A protein has these predicted regions:
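Extracellular glycan-interacting surfaces
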Residues: 4-15, 22-699
Length: 699
């Protein structure tokens, strides 16, 4: 039944790729906002203060102080899509580490990665390269024995990952889609495997398997399995139908009562290393705890906490860390009677928009995607050193774009409409959005008031033609589109007379400073990604397949053609010399004749997936960002040659000049600030950073 997987020299050369730890801290600093998704936690048995944290974007963070603070440590995988659900230190030689990863986007991609130098370099183990590894365990009695659960079965290594053998029946319909594995603490041939359907067990290293579903509800997705090290016949497992316990090594399971249906998806179980009667259950409905081996349970966190992993300090079991969705790391020193966020230095946030305050550049505003009530809008009054959340009224909406009016009012384009913030202590209010052509009307109407004091914004910016603030409308007078069905507003631009919003229901415009917006298609196209307004009055509008250019504030549009080999559009920029820069899936394209002809430029730029080219007026240069580039590209010669900044360790979606440095919105790690000064101080306009793809909870 077992089949050995041979690691040939050719395969070794192809896939045993080294993933190195960059000197990220010397080039860039993560500003936050802190928090976000954490997938896994693991401590060093020789020094439990040394903890590694895994994310759903292939990153490892490290803590040297027991989880009180974090630093970006390593990036694993070729892209940003590896979900790192399992991290194991070899107890006999803790510089040896194993990490299991699976691709968020491709079921045919995944790895087990090994480091022999404490995580400074990594290599993918070639024999299991390409497997979507969802579970990883090390035998407590033999640390050279590793077992992985993948979508195509169960595999074992008895030499620290050098070679692997399949120990589940090949092409067997039931023992596949493995989500959890556990190894008996005394006998490494006794292995439990949980599938998307039910649990299985082998007692002879995979020679034979038998179902251990007796006592369980059918079609139970098995998330986690633990075996009591002090009494191996006691087995706990969690499934979508609840938590089960067996006292006879899986022959019969009993469903544990006491945890409500709302928390029934228990993603992880962990047992107190000193008191085996204490078991923690990390669920989608909070952290639950039992003191009597599962007979009774109590909720020990807020019920909306989604727990992905649990770490218990072996020296002091009352010290517990949780890896959570959206909330980052939660930490407790008293068994979770009390707990606090512990995210200093850790950010796994998808930035939808970032702007610098027009009058006070130490004030930064950020909108995030995918974090629901723990996301929304954040602001900093000290240049990103600390952040506060202000999302009341957003109702868990994602913020895809941000802009600030001259009055100081913040406007947010969300996944359901446009909102504005009259006061940081108040609630966000929806702007009226109406499908149809904008009727002729006066432009001299009151705008929403500033979220700061009227005195601070009693006059407009120098050179502005807009009127000062007079009052705050109590509510929109007309809402033709129901708020729940409001368009997805991917990009906002504020110009002198007309404001613009690129949405999935057309281009919306406002002439009353954001109180009311009218939207309609442009040249028959309704689904737009981004709109840009430039100093010369020109506008660019980009949809997934079309690009448009206007030189008269959007009164008329010209569709710009582009090469047929281009399969995806990201952004179109007009630079001061009048030339066009197009960011595409096939790289950066440049046109000097209004889009009649295009040149695919490299000169140091990546050949594919250039998000956008920006003009940095303060630095008198072009900036560009690209997928997986882990930095920002700059050109001082009009785009003929490009140099990349220092390694950020993470993918960057957009960048701006901020006080002489680059302020960048990363793909998954919040804001980053370049450490070295490069140009004169400048408060830049807002940057649009894009949207997130599926969450790691999706299989």
């Amino acid at each position: 039944m077992r089949k050995t997987i041979v690691s040939t020299v050719k395969l070794l050369l192809c896939v045993a790729v080294l993933f190195t730890v960059g000197s990220y801290a010397s080039d860039w600093r993560l500003l936050g906002p802190e928090g976000g998704d954490v997938r896994s936690l693991s401590y060093d048995p020789a020094d439990p203060n040394h903890i590694l944290l895994g994310t759903s974007a292939g990153q490892l963070f490290v803590s040297q102080d027991g989880g009180n603070s974090w630093a970006l440590f390593a990036h694993l995988g070729a892209g940003d899509d590896y979900v790192l659900d399992h991290i194991i230190f070899d107890p006999t030689h803790t510089a040896t580490l194993y990490v299991a990863g699976w691709s968020l986007y491709n079921k045919e991609e995944g790895d087990v990665l090994r480091s022999d130098d404490g995580g400074h370099t990594w290599r993918a183990l070639p024999a299991v390269h390409g497997k979507s590894v969802r579970a990883l365990a090390m035998a407590p009695s033999d640390h050279n024995t590793l077992v992985i659960g993948a979508l195509d079965g169960v595999f074992r290594s008895r030499d620290g990952g050098a070679t692997w053998e399949r120990i589940s029946p090949e092409n067997y319909a039931e023992i596949k889609n493995i989500e959890s594995v556990a190894i008996d603490p005394e006998n490494p041939d006794v292995i439990y495997a949980g599938t998307f359907h039910l649990p299985w067990k082998t007692e002879d290293g995979g020679q034979s398997w038998h179902s251990i579903q007796q006592g369980m509800l059918l079609d139970s997705d098995v998330f986690s399995i633990i075996v009591d090290p002090s009494r191996p016949t006691t087995v706990f497992l969690s499934a979508c139908s609840g938590i089960y316990k067996s006292v006879n090594a899986g022959t019969l399971f009993s469903r544990i009562r006491g945890i409500p249906h709302s928390a029934i998806r228990t993603r992880v179980l962990k047992q107190d290393p000193k008191r085996p009667g204490i078991v923690y259950a990390g669920t989608t409905g909070g952290l639950w705890k039992t003191f009597d081996g599962g007979n009774t349970w109590e909720l020990y966190s807020a019920p909306d906490v989604i727990v992905n992993d649990i770490l218990i300090d072996p020296r002091q079991p009352e010290r517990v860390l949780l890896a959570t969705d959206r909330g980052g790391v939660l930490a407790s020193d008293d068994g979770f009677d009390h707990y606090l966020s512990s995210n200093r230095g850790f950010s796994h946030r998808v930035i939808g928009g970032v702007i610098v305050d027009h009058q006070d550049p130490s004030r930064l505003y950020v909108g995030v995607v995918n974090d629901k009530d723990r996301g929304g809008f954040f602001f900093s009054e000290d240049g990103g050193q600390s952040w506060r959340q202000s999302n009341r009224g957003l109702d868990e909406r994602d913020i895809l774009s941000l802009q600030q009016a001259d009055s100081g009012v913040i406007f947010a384009g969300t996944n359901h409409g446009i909102f504005y913030l009259p006061s940081f202590q108040g609630a966000w209010l929806p702007a009226a959005m109406i499908l149809g052509k904008r009727p002729p009307e006066s432009e001299n109407v009151a705008a929403p008031a500033s979220p700061r004091s009227k005195a601070a914004h009693s006059s407009t910016k120098a050179g502005s033609k807009r009127k000062p603030v007079t009052h705050v409308p109590k509510a929109p007078l007309e809402v033709a589109i129901a708020t729940a069905k409001a368009p997805r507003v991917r990009s906002l631009q504020i110009a002198d007379k007309v404001w613009y919003a690129a949405t999935d229901q057309g281009l919306f415009t406002s002439v009353d400073q954001g109180s009311k917006w009218y939207g309609e298609p442009v040249e028959g196209e309704s689904d737009f990604i981004v709109v840009n307004h430039f100093a010369d009055g020109s506008l660019t509008l980009v949809s997934p397949k079309h690009i448009f250019l206007s030189h008269d504030e959007g009164e008329s549009w010209t569709e710009i053609s582009y090469p047929q080999y281009v399969t995806g559009l990201y952004n179109l920029t007009v630079v001061p010399d009048g030339s066009l820069w197009l960011g595409t899936r096939e790289g950066a394209l440049h046109s000097t004749d209004g889009g009649k002809t295009w040149q695919h430029l490299l000169g140091g730029l990546p050949p594919r997936n250039v998000f956008a080219v920006y003009y940095d007026a303060a630095g008198q240069r072009l900036l560009a960002t690209a997928l997986f580039a882990h930095g920002v590209f700059a050109s001082k010669d009009g785009g003929r040659s490009w140099q990349r900044t220092g390694d950020a360790g993470v993918s960057i979606r957009s960048a701006m000049n901020y006080r002489g440095r680059l302020l960048a919105a990363s793909a998954y790690n919040g804001l980053l600030l370049e450490q070295s000064s490069v140009v004169v101080e400048s408060a830049a306009d807002g940057a649009h950073a894009g949207e997130r793809t599926p969450s790691a909870s999706q299989r």
